[in-house]
Amino acid sequence: MPFRAVPGYFATYPNEDFQGLDSTKNNHLELINHKDWKELYDAIPRNTKNCHYKLLILSRHGQGYHNAAILRYGMGEWDAYWSLLSGDEHGEWLDSKLTPLGKDQVRRTGSNVLLPMVKQLGMLPHVFFSSPMRRCLETFIESWTPVLAETQEVPAGTNISIRIIEGLRETLGSHLCDKRVAHSMAVDEYQDFNTESGCIVHWQYAPDYPEDDELWLPDHRETCAEMDKRTLNGLFELFNQLSNEEKFISLTCHSGVIQSVLRNLQHPPIYNLDTGKVVAIVVEVPVNTADRGRL
């Protein structure tokens, strides 16, 4: 694997032999060898001529209408029937938006997790990335709004740019919740969103970003191996955009993406990660990543 998680920072990966943990029974963000985020950040290895090191924050989106439907109907009925529809009487889940509970979840994550992290580090992430799905765009807005409001170095009118990576999406195919709406619709709904503190959220798409979803297929559900390959290509795209100095990185994405990232980074599994939760990883990135191309 070209990228590698570095152990010894968080409860999710204390040592090389660790077999994983259940996030419902453990504080998976616990700092195991450092008193706070600043001390942890300062302990991340310095860049060398061969490797760079990044603090990667992976935020799972809050509860979407599809997540609520899974709780309502059960996974068996969801997979067999409801996932193939675009919604029910409780809401639509084609490229699902967040439920009111989902918005509340990620607001609390912003106030209770991201804000203390940013305050202790004394800075916002150097670069923000996101999945293109609407539940992730809404999660970024709702979770980072309270952080931006409390960050004096970010005055009203500041543009906050988030780079969209099309490949870092949830498992593709069959389930309509994972089909992206037209690009123009998402832009109309979310581009240049004004936060409560007056910051402007700007989504940065590739110049040739497709209007329609070219990845999702109605008759094939992506396998784990297929997703891991796609996710690895997404990680290449992400890390290739970073300079040496851009070390603190945020990605708003999905449970499936997070699990795939963990596998690609040779990181122990994190079980039962709830909607709206955050995972942090120190990542070793080879300097010649850009020369390796896509897989």
PLM features: residue spans?
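A short, acidic, amphipathic alpha-helical segment used as a generic capping/interface helix at domain edges
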Residues: 227-244
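Beta-strand elements within well-structured catalytic alpha/beta cores of enzymes
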Residues: 51-59, 129, 246-257, 261
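Active-site signature of alpha/beta-hydrolase-fold catalytic machinery across serine-
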Residues: 142, 260, 264
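Active-site-proximal alpha-helix that buttresses catalytic centers in soluble enzyme cores
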Residues: 1-160, 164, 173, 224-231
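Domain-level recognition of soluble alpha/beta enzyme cores
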Residues: 78-81, 97, 266-292
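Histidine/lysine/aspartate-rich catalytic loop segments that bind and position anionic ligands
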Residues: 163, 168-169, 179-218
